[in-house]
Amino acid sequence: MAWKQILKADPTEWLLEQEDPSVRFWALQDLEGKVFDHPEVKEAQDVLMESPPVRAILDAQQPEGHWVHREDMYLPKYKATTHSLLILAELGVRRTPVIERGLEHIFEFQRDSGHFLTNLPKTAKGRASVVKDGCCLDASVLYYISHFGYLDDPRVVRLLDFIVGYHSAEEAGWKCRAFPIDPDAVFPVNCYMGAAKTLRALSTIS
């Protein structure tokens, strides 16, 4: 592979070690070119599903499908529902009934326009929100929804239409709710972190 020529050493063997099934799962596909149905890939995912990090996250889910707080999918960071599902997707976890319960809970946060906010809508007015400043949240949701095989769901189509629709050609990106509240934190007007997350999510669609 051409990219290996610029490295001081070939890390492939290390990345394929059995002790980290998530890294092995992705390396087999992205570096070795093995298809998802390849026996080695499926075996790595089987091991991943029983790994301590995955079991800890799945076991923390509440019976209703959420993690931590039902009304807030975002806080506390890295433990709440959207973070838990994102981490599981990034690790390479497969879709299961537990995952499906979590995703159905996430869809409760979707507004009529297709986008997501962190709090459950309590009124028709709240569900009618068309806030166009949360590309990072929408992108994270799209990433794990795509990973878990929901792209044909009409609710996801609405999300995709919303994301594409609020891209700013003039500013070459997506606006962030932190600008201009704190201009020093995000510059320029479009958010490079939100754009990176959005492009990553869109890249999963084939």
Predicted regions and their residues:
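Preference for long, amphipathic alpha-helical scaffolds in soluble/luminal domains
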Residues: 1-206
